[in-house]
Amino acid sequence: MRIEGILTVAPGLHGAARSDASGNVVEAAGQLDAESLCAVAAMCKVPLEAASELLGLGGLRDFSFSYGQGAFYVHHDGGFVCVVGGPSKSPETIMKKIAHAAGDL
């Protein structure tokens, strides 16, 4: 599956990008600032991993941020798959669909 396919896993998704572990964009589709979003994902990784370790949650795989105007989803698999979309009442479900589809990239 190409990165464009990620946008079809749930309604309201409008941009997706794939990057390496440093946040350097490899592929992007849709309406988003891929460079900035992938850089944010890379910068969030270390503090979120530390929080996960302190809480005994295991390794970081996925994370998402929901805000009034939309949501930011990140699947971590050595690199990142970053997706932006509109607000959702079920961000966990969308994150699971993105992670599943990202495994096919």
For each predicted feature, which ranges?
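Non-catalytic interaction/Regulatory regions outside core domains
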Residues: M1-L105
